[in-house]
């Protein structure tokens, strides 16, 4: 399950007065089974970089492959890619949207084709795995503390059983 970037460049708002070069000629290979950390200053492009891993952002130039296939190839199944390469956003508010926690965590598995009942099994396992208490499953995710929101966001991705898990600032705002 390797991810490889070759000469990846990304520019926000190209050709405008707001043009920003976020990534320039990035070459990176992440072999199967590896744990890696990407560090850098605020605004250095870390979040932009990882959003390329599951095709949330298309590079301005360069290629990205997953298991040897170009993820921007004409016939490539990016929906399947996003099921295999799970991304937890830096800010959980960018990820949470349902009326209650359990429904929010069920969204991904249901989007993958599971029934509501099957999705609930996966969601409950994921929520328990991140230490989220069952008594809070019916709460609105927007009523939770920052740390609880982060746990729900992580559970939402874990419930999809991705082969690769990408965490953007995973410990920021976690409650003890």
Please tell me what each predicted stretch does.
Residues 117-135:
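Conserved ABC ATPase "signature" region
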Residues 54:
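Helix-to-loop junction immediately C-terminal to a conserved catalytic motif
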Residues 62-73, 81:
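Conserved ABC transporter NBD signature motif
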Residues 165-168:
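Catalytic Walker B motif of ABC-type/P-loop ATPase nucleotide-binding domains
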Residues 161:
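Conserved catalytic motifs of ABC-family nucleotide-binding domains
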